[in-house]
UniProtKB/Swiss-Prot annotation:
<protein>
    <recommendedName>
        <fullName>tRNA pseudouridine synthase B</fullName>
        <ecNumber>5.4.99.25</ecNumber>
    </recommendedName>
</protein>
<dbReference type="GO" id="GO:0160148">
    <property type="term" value="F:tRNA pseudouridine(55) synthase activity"/>
</dbReference>
<dbReference type="InterPro" id="IPR014780">
    <property type="entry name" value="tRNA_psdUridine_synth_TruB"/>
</dbReference>
<keyword id="KW-0413">Isomerase</keyword>
<feature type="active site" description="Nucleophile">
    <location>
        <position position="47"/>
    </location>
</feature>
<comment type="function">
    <text>Responsible for synthesis of pseudouridine from uracil-55 in the psi GC loop of transfer RNAs.</text>
</comment>
<dbReference type="GO" id="GO:1990481">
    <property type="term" value="P:mRNA pseudouridine synthesis"/>
</dbReference>
<dbReference type="Pfam" id="PF09157">
    <property type="entry name" value="TruB-C_2"/>
</dbReference>
<dbReference type="InterPro" id="IPR032819">
    <property type="entry name" value="TruB_C"/>
</dbReference>
<dbReference type="InterPro" id="IPR020103">
    <property type="entry name" value="PsdUridine_synth_cat_dom_sf"/>
</dbReference>
<comment type="similarity">
    <text>Belongs to the pseudouridine synthase TruB family. Type 1 subfamily.</text>
</comment>
<dbReference type="InterPro" id="IPR015947">
    <property type="entry name" value="PUA-like_sf"/>
</dbReference>
<dbReference type="InterPro" id="IPR015240">
    <property type="entry name" value="tRNA_sdUridine_synth_fam1_C"/>
</dbReference>
<dbReference type="InterPro" id="IPR002501">
    <property type="entry name" value="PsdUridine_synth_N"/>
</dbReference>
<dbReference type="Pfam" id="PF01509">
    <property type="entry name" value="TruB_N"/>
</dbReference>
<dbReference type="GO" id="GO:0031119">
    <property type="term" value="P:tRNA pseudouridine synthesis"/>
</dbReference>
<dbReference type="Pfam" id="PF16198">
    <property type="entry name" value="TruB_C_2"/>
</dbReference>
């Protein structure tokens, strides 16, 4: 007999503003508990040092978390110049101290080097795996393993300020970009070394900065609900973004009610007007209810790829 899921069936996305000093998984578990969700997942971890946007997918929204993981990100970063650390951030040990002697022109020239399409060798202090183990576990044991340079794109790299030995930048980049590595490489290019002392993720995909909520805000709403003898969901659920926002950049295909039953059973249905081999966002009927994503083929058939399960929330515990 299958074990019944704990928590309620709730689908949506929370834009969490993660605080510094906590792991992304800790933040995820807190959000899951506040919403009493049966399932939750985040869309790309932030280092404990980092703050900012951490989209948390609840319920069926977890089926589309990969699309947010693959999306562009934006960061505000402050680097301390003149010191290099073994982790490329302030959590590590200082391994080298050098004078700061570059000119403004040299700084601007160095920044230009990182814009556009480049190759980046990931830090040893990352969650990437080598022979089944995260790189940071090797690093903690003093073992360096080979890492291949990976293609990344820096769409924008904006100079914000240079105050004393602290340099602040705004970086819009592709998935898989390590900001700590950019700062470490920049410090070496400038000849003085550098490491991250503040890192804040300000954007994931298209999600707006002003929609973020903190754990403290969620906790306060739960406390208010308990004080007023309300179900916490009555206050929390209004913060959820629809799960189809994770694939909002996909073109929509609306399937008529007459074909809906076939589609929801996993069968391809005939539609027209879209390019083949393209992922699409599927809605049903006149209500345009989101039910998943699919792919068009050359014959005008829409094949479902990931469909959501429609639950009766009244039966969830």
């Amino acid at each position: 007999m299958a074990r019944r899921s704990k928590g309620r069936f709730i689908d949506g996305i929370v834009l969490l503003d993660k605080a510094t000093g906590m792991s992304s998984n800790f933040a995820l578990q807190r959000v899951k508990r506040f919403f009493n969700a049966n399932k939750a997942g985040h869309t790309g971890a932030l280092d404990p040092l980092a703050t900012g946007m951490l989209p948390i997918c609840l319920g069926e929204a977890t089926k589309f978390s990969q699309h947010l993981l693959d999306s562009d990100k934006r960061y505000l970063v402050t680097a301390k110049l003149g010191q290099r650390t073994d982790t490329s951030d302030s959590d590590g040990e200082v391994v080298q101290t050098r004078p700061i002697e570059f000119t403004e022109a040299q700084l601007m020239s160095a920044l230009e080097h990182f814009r556009g399409d480049t190759l980046q060798v990931p830090s040893m202090y990352s969650a990437l795996k080598y022979q089944g183990q995260p790189l940071y576990k090797y690093a903690r044991e003093g073992i360096e393993v080979p890492r291949e340079a990976r293609p990344i794109t820096v769409f924008e790299l904006n100079f914000i300020s240079l105050e004393g030995d602290e340099l602040t930048l705004d970086i819009h980049c592709s998935k898989g970009t390590y900001i700590r590595t950019i700062i470490d490489d920049l410090g070496e290019m400038l000849g003085c070394g550098a490491h991250v002392i503040m890192l804040r993720r300000t954007q994931v995909a298209h999600y707006p900065y002003d929609k973020m909520v903190t754990l403290e805000q969620l906790e306060a709403l739960v406390a208010k609900a308990q004080e007023e003898q309300l179900d916490p969901s009555s206050l929390l659920d209004s913060l959820l973004l629809p799960m189809d926002t994770a694939v909002a950049d996909f073109p929509e295909v609306n399937v008529p009610d007459a074909s809906a039953a076939y589609l929801m059973q996993g069968q391809a249905v005939r539609v027209s007007g879209l390019v083949a081999d393209k992922l699409v966002r599927i809605t049903l009927g006149t209500e345009r209810r989101f039910v998943g994503i699919g792919e068009m083929n050359e014959d005008g058939l829409l094949a479902p790829k990931r469909l959501v399960v429609i639950h009766d929330q009244a039966k969830a515990s």
